[in-house]
Swiss-Prot record:
Catalytic activity: molybdopterin + ATP + H(+) = adenylyl-molybdopterin + diphosphate; adenylyl-molybdopterin + molybdate = Mo-molybdopterin + AMP + H(+)
Keyword field contains Ribosomal protein: no
Residues with the Phosphoserine modification: 188, 194, 200, 262, 268, 270, 305
Organism field: Homo sapiens
Keyword Phosphoprotein: yes
Name the UniProt record assigns to this protein: Gephyrin
Pfam families, sorted: MoCF_biosynth, MoeA_C, MoeA_N
Gene Ontology BP terms: establishment of protein localization; establishment of synaptic specificity at neuromuscular junction; gamma-aminobutyric acid receptor clustering; glycine receptor clustering; Mo-molybdopterin cofactor biosynthetic process; molybdopterin cofactor biosynthetic process; neurotransmitter receptor localization to postsynaptic specialization membrane; response to metal ion
Membership in a protein family: In the N-terminal section; belongs to the MoaB/Mog family.
C-alpha cells in the first residue's frame, strides 16, 4: 500500500481486489457461487477494471463473520477494493449492509445511488436492494446483489468511477491530477451519472460495459443485446458504460464445491482456483486478436526457411511467451476458430453432422386416421353389443367399405380407419360370437365396452403436421434425426462441413511404429494417438508423417498441411530445446499469429495455438507438446472443442460431471488434468474416479483405459491435497 503523500505512477501495482460471497447455501456447498466467480472474471478483465484478485471467500449470512473478513481484508491485506455479493435484500438473514456499516468509517452514498438508479431502470424490484458503499482506511467496500445478473449490472453501473475512486484512496497524485485537469477542460459538465469525458485516461472502462443474464433468462441467440433508446431521458446501464462484445458461448462460470480462499499466482496473471471454470467461456471474452493475412501463393511457394539455426548460443534461455491461464487460452481458441461453410449431403451420411438449415415436413404424419391398436373399428354411438364384421383393414391398404350402424371392421395397428367408424376397441375387450365353418373368417363379435369417439385413433397430422419444422438449424444429428429425415422424405440436407485435420510428429529421434529400434531412437506414438483421437470423433484426417527437427522440413510439412487441411496438429518442437524451431517457423516463415505459447496447466505447459489467414480462409494450427500424455490431454482440452465448433456444434465444450475420488490426490502448483477411470458403484448417484497411477507426461500408460480427466485446482496454503471420497469435477474423454 502507498503511504501518505506517495506518488503513484502508471507503472505501480494493479488494483488489488477481494470478492466476498455472502450466502448460506454457497457456504454449505448446496449451490454454486456463480456471482462471485463472475465478479472475479470482470475484475481481472483488462478491458474493464484490469485488477488482480488478492482474496476470495464464501461466508454464511452472519454479521460477525462478514465483519471479521472485511476488517481483515482492509487492515491486514490492505486491499484497494472489496466487492461483496449477496445478503442485500429484505430476507431475515440478509445482513450484509448492517455488517458493512459497522466496518466502514465513511460512506460513499453516490455509488449506492448509482446502483439503485441503474437497477430501477432494469426492474422495479431494484428498489428492494439495500446496498451500502463506504471506505475503511484506504479500502473501498461495495455491496452488490446476490444474483449473477444483478451483481454484474451493478458492477457495470459504478465501473466508470472505480479507477478514479481507488486512485484517490491510494493518493495516486499523478493520475488524480490528470483526471481533474481533463474535467476542468470540459466546456460544460456532463449529465448526472453519464460516462466520463472521452479523453479520460479510463476511457477503456467507459467503452467496455458488461451485460450478462442468468442462464434461464438468456436469449435464444445466446447473445444478450441490451436495447438503448437514445431519446430517453432515463439513466440506463447502457448510458453509463457500453456493452462489451458478446462471448462465444453465453454461459455462467461453475465452481468447485469447496471454498478456495487463497488463489495461487503466476508471474503474469492470477489463474482461478476453481477447476471447472477453466473450460467455461466467461461472459466477458478477451479482446479479439487479428490474425495476419497472407497470400496462399506466397506461403506455398516458400520451401526454404528464413530461421537462422547457426547462432545456438543466442537462443532464448527463458520463453518469450507469457504464461496464459487455462481460462484465457480456452476462450481464445474458441474465439479464433471459425465455423466452416456448408455442403449438401445425402441424409444417410448425416450421422454426426450439424444441420445448416431448418427441415420442414412435406406431408402429414399419419397421412390418414390410423389405428393405435389391433382390434375393431366401431361406431362409438352403437355402444356395447353384438356386431357383424364386414371385413378388415390392414396396414398399407386403404379400406373401401363404410361401417354402418351395427357393423364393425377388424383393424391392425397402423391401419387406416374406414369411413363410418370413429373409434377402435382393442381385441382384449371383445368376444368372438360366430366364425366361418372353416375358421378362416370372423363373422360376428361382441363389443364388451363403451367406446368414446376418437378412442385409440391417431388423427391426420397427429405426429407431424405438413409444414412443421421437424429439425432446426444447428441440430447435431444422431440416429433418431436420420430416421426423422427419412420419415418426412427429406433425402438431401445442408450441413456444416467437417474440418479436415492434418497430423504430424516432429523429432529427429522418431521412428515409424513398424521400424526396429536403433540407438538413440524411439517409436512415434503421438501421431497414432492423435489420429485415432480425431477419427474417434468422426473427422477426416491426413497423416503428414514424421518431420525432422529442421526448419526447412518443418516449413514444407506445414505448407502441405495448410494446402490440404483446415486444421494442422503438430507434436513436439515447442519447448526450449535448441532444436525446437516450430514456433520460429510459424512466426518468421508463415507469418502466423501465435495467440499463446505457454499455458498454466499440467500437463501441457508449452501448448501453442496459432492462426493463419490465407486469401480470406483461416487455418488453425495446434502445436502440442512432445510428451505423449501431454499431447493427448491437450488434444482433448483444446483441439476437440475447436473441431466441434468448426463443424457448427452450438456448445462445443466437453462434458463435465461430478465424481468421488477413490484415493487421496496431491495437488500441484498448476491446475492439473489427472487421468482417471470412472466407474459406478451399485445404487450410488455419483461415479468413483480411480487414478491411473503415475502421472508423468511421458508415461502413456497413464492414459490406458482412462475415460476422464480429474480437473484439479492448483495447490494453495490451505489445500495441498484432496482426500478420498471428496467430490471433484471430471472431464469425460471416453465412453462411460
Amino acid at each position: 500500500m502507498a503511504t501518505e503523500g506517495m506518488i503513484l505512477t502508471n507503472h505501480d501495482h494493479q488494483i488489488r481486489v477481494g470478492v466476498l460471497t455472502v450466502s448460506d447455501s454457497c457456504f454449505r456447498n448446496l449451490a454454486e457461487d456463480r456471482s462471485g466467480i463472475n465478479l472475479k472474471d470482470l475484475v481481472q478483465d483488462p478491458s474493464l477494471l484490469g485488477g488482480t484478485i488478492s482474496a476470495y471467500k464464501i461466508v454464511p449470512d452472519e454479521i460477525e463473520e462478514i465483519k471479521e473478513t472485511l476488517i481483515d481484508w482492509c487492515d491486514e491485506k490492505e486491499l484497494n477494493l472489496i466487492l461483496t455479493t449477496g445478503g442485500t435484500g429484505f430476507a431475515p438473514r440478509d445482513v450484509t449492509p448492517e455488517a458493512t456499516k459497522e466496518v466502514i468509517e465513511r460512506e460513499a452514498p453516490g455509488m449506492a445511488l448509482a446502483m439503485l438508479m441503474g437497477s430501477l431502470n432494469v426492474t422495479p424490484l431494484g428498489m428492494l436492494s439495500r446496498p451500502v458503499c463506504g471506505i475503511r482506511g484506504k479500502t473501498l467496500i461495495i455491496n452488490l446483489p446476490g444474483s449473477k445478473k444483478g451483481s454484474q449490472e451493478c458492477f457495470q453501473f459504478i465501473l466508470p468511477a472505480l479507477p478514479h475512486a481507488i486512485d484517490l484512496l491510494r493518493d495516486a497524485i499523478v493520475k488524480v491530477k490528470e483526471v481533474h485537469d481533463e474535467l476542468e477542460d470540459l466546456p460544460s459538465p456532463p449529465p448526472p451519472l453519464s460516462p466520463p469525458p472521452t479523453t479520460s485516461p479510463h476511457k477503456q472502462t467507459e467503452d467496455k460495459g458488461v451485460q450478462c443474464e442468468e442462464e434461464e433468462e438468456e436469449k435464444k441467440d445466446s447473445g444478450v443485446a441490451s436495447t438503448e433508446d437514445s431519446s430517453s431521458s432515463h439513466i440506463t446501464a447502457a448510458a453509463i458504460a457500453a456493452k462489451i462484445p458478446d462471448s462465444i458461448i453465453s454461459r455462467g462460470v461453475q465452481v468447485l464445491p469447496r471454498d478456495t480462499a487463497s488463489l495461487s499466482t503466476t508471474p503474469s496473471e492470477s489463474p482461478r482456483a476453481q477447476a471447472t471454470s477453466r473450460l467455461s467461456t466467461a461472459s466477458c471474452p478477451t479482446p479479439k486478436v487479428q490474425s495476419r493475412c497472407s497470400s496462399k501463393e506466397n506461403i506455398l511457394r516458400a520451401s526454404h526457411s528464413a530461421v537462422d539455426i547457426t547462432k545456438v548460443a543466442r537462443r532464448h534461455r527463458m520463453s518469450p511467451f507469457p504464461l496464459t491461464s487455462m481460462d484465457k487460452a480456452f476462450i481464445t481458441v474458441l474465439e479464433m476458430t471459425p465455423v466452416l461453410g456448408t455442403e449438401i449431403i445425402n441424409y444417410r451420411d448425416g450421422m454426426g453432422r450439424v444441420l445448416a438449415q431448418d427441415v420442414y415436413a412435406k406431408d402429414n404424419l399419419p397421412p390418414f386416421p390410423a389405428s393405435v391398436k389391433d382390434g375393431y373399428a366401431v361406431r362409438a354411438a352403437d355402444g356395447p353389443g353384438d356386431r357383424f364384421i364386414i371385413g378388415e383393414s390392414q396396414a398399407g391398404e386403404q379400406p373401401t367399405q363404410t361401417v354402418m350402424p351395427g357393423q364393425v371392421m377388424r383393424v391392425t395397428t397402423g391401419a387406416p380407419i374406414p369411413c363410418g367408424a370413429d373409434a377402435v376397441v382393442q381385441v382384449e375387450d371383445t368376444e368372438l360370437i360366430r366364425e366361418s365353418d372353416d375358421g378362416t373368417e370372423e363373422l360376428e363379435v361382441r363389443i364388451l365396452v363403451q367406446a368414446r369417439p376418437g378412442q385409440d385413433i391417431r388423427p391426420i397430422g397427429h405426429d407431424i403436421k405438413r409444414g412443421e419444422c421437424v429439425l432446426a438449424k444447428g441440430t447435431h444429428m444422431g440416429p433418431s434425426e436420420i430416421g426423422l429425415l427419412a420419415t418426412v422424405g427429406v433425402t438431401e440436407v445442408e450441413v456444416n462441413k467437417f474440418p479436415v485435420v492434418a497430423v504430424m510428429s516432429t523429432g529427429n529421434e522418431l521412428l515409424n511404429p513398424e521400424d526396429d529400434l536403433l540407438p538413440g531412437k524411439i517409436r512415434d506414438s503421438n501421431r497414432s494417438t492423435l489420429l485415432a483421437t480425431i477419427q474417434e470423433h468422426g473427422y477426416p484426417t491426413i497423416n503428414l508423417g514424421i518431420v525432422g527437427d529442421n526448419p526447412d522440413d518443418l516449413l514444407n510439412a506445414l505448407n502441405e498441411g495448410i494446402s490440404r487441411a483446415d486444421v494442422i496438429i503438430t507434436s513436439g518442437g515447442v519447448s526450449m530445446g535448441e532444436k525446437d524451431y516450430l514456433k520460429q517457423v510459424l512466426d518468421i516463415d508463415l507469418h502466423a499469429q501465435i495467440h499463446f505459447g505457454r499455458v498454466f496447466m499440467k500437463p501441457g505447459l508449452p501448448t501453442t495455438f496459432a492462426t493463419l489467414d490465407i486469401d480470406g480462409v483461416r487455418k488453425i494450427i495446434f502445436a502440442l507438446p512432445g510428451n505423449p500424455v501431454s499431447a493427448v490431454v491437450t488434444c482433448n482440452l483444446f483441439v476437440v472443442p475447436a473441431l466441434r465448433k468448426m463443424q457448427g456444434i452450438l456448445d462445443p465444450r466437453p462434458t463435465i460431471i461430478k465424481a468421488r475420488l477413490s484415493c487421496d490426490v496431491k495437488l500441484d502448483p498448476r491446475p492439473e488434468y489427472h487421468r482417471c477411470i470412472l466407474t459406478w458403484h451399485h445404487q450410488e448417484p455419483l461415479p468413483w474416479a480411480q487414478s491411473t497411477g503415475n502421472q508423468m507426461s511421458s508415461r502413456l500408460m497413464s492414459m490406458r483405459s482412462a475415460n476422464g480427466l480429474l480437473m484439479l485446482p492448483p495447490k494453495t496454503e490451505q489445500y495441498v491435497e484432496l482426500h478420498k471420497g471428496e467430490v471433484v469435477d471430471v472431464m469425460v474423454i471416453g465412453r462411460l
